[in-house]
């Protein structure tokens, strides 16, 4: 009887221990791998097997921009939900959303004439990319863009400067 009581007490004490902390493997992920050269990988917010791939779209220069993003380019003409990675060919003519302040010029614009369209430079030194989250400041408008994604939904949050033009 004493042995049964001891075994019961030992089992009870064993059940009271804390579970081991789970390893956060997402800290090992670098979403920018393949965004330069001929990688054709987009940077943005997505999850494995998700229906949306939310990210920035740059002014395309050559076929290396077919994912919408290239590491060598800091232009942004908008943010969209359906980027493709590694395809080598342009995707589905994405509908883009571009947050702006001040007067609006309804055109894509060019790098040669910064006021010719909606685009902005992105401050890549402050760009944050991690699984399910993307953030970058748009220097032309003083806006911080933040994107996140779940399996079926992409969400945008824009932080505008305190201004009457915002």
Predicted regions and their residues:
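Sec-dependent signal peptide recognition
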Residues: 1-9
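Accessory carbohydrate-recognition regions in carbohydrate-active enzymes
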Residues: 20-166
């Amino acid at each position: 009887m004493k042995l049964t009581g001891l075994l019961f007490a030992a089992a009870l004490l064993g059940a009271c221990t804390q579970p081991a902390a789970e390893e956060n493997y997402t800290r090992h992920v670098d979403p920018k791998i393949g965004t330069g050269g001929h990688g054709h990988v987009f940077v943005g917010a997505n999850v494995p097997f998700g229906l949306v791939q939310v990210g920035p779209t740059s002014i395309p220069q050559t076929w290396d921009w077919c994912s919408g993003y290239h590491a060598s380019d800091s232009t942004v003409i908008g943010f969209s939900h359906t980027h493709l990675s590694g395809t080598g060919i342009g995707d589905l003519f994405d509908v883009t959303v571009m947050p702006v302040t001040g007067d609006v010029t309804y055109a894509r614009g060019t790098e040669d004439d910064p006021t010719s369209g909606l685009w902005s430079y992105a401050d890549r030194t402050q760009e944050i990319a991690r699984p399910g989250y993307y953030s970058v400041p748009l220097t032309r408008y003083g806006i911080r863009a933040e994107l996140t994604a779940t399996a079926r939904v992409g969400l945008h949050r824009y932080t505008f400067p305190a201004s009457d033009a915002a």
